[in-house]
Amino acid sequence: MPLLIAVVALVGTLCTVNLVLTLGVIRRLREHTELLGAVQGEPLRLEVGQEVGDFDTASTLGEPLVRDLVTGPVLFGFFSPTCEPCRDKLPRFVEHARHEPGGRSSVIATVVGDADAAAEFVSELSEVAQVVVEDSDGVMGTALGIRAFPSVLRAEHAADGRLVVVDGDVALGRPAGLTA
């Protein structure tokens, strides 16, 4: 009988410790959820319906890229050579851009980083896009509110003539021209 009492007391103690630890974990998870909610408050890029900001720059080949000169739908891609997901997404972006209805002139790819590090990306993208290399606070990233890489957006002119985002996260497996 004393052995049974000891076992029941031990199981009861273990259950109590488990309950206290579980409640502690739940409390910490709530704190982390609140912290993550505050950090994730800002969007990572312009959202659908938002106007593309002004940009006036040139591609690596010297082609002028000015928001007011954009005439049709444009696919924007943003990549960083230091970003592993960017390396994974780059071949799919290149393949998707190859089938854009407007061809190379309807695709603008921005590589964020120094020119030497960006050279490999520029080489792959130049066939299918007008490529810009800029710093993290560059004109293209600012115009589209980019805060994360990789980012792929599509913009078109609205009825009032403004260039607005129509797809804030282009699915590269979808045929070109289809929006969300």
What are these regions (language model features)?
Residues 90-125, 137:
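Structural microenvironment flanking redox-active thiols in thiol-disulfide oxidoreductases
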Residues 34-67:
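N-terminal "domain-start" segment that seeds a small globular fold
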Residues 1-47:
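Long, leucine- and charge-enriched amphipathic alpha-helices
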Residues 124-151:
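Short, internal strand/loop/helix patches
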Residues 147, 153-180:
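Non-catalytic, surface beta->alpha helical segment in thiol-disulfide oxidoreductase systems
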Residues 78-81, 110-114, 135, 157:
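Structural motif
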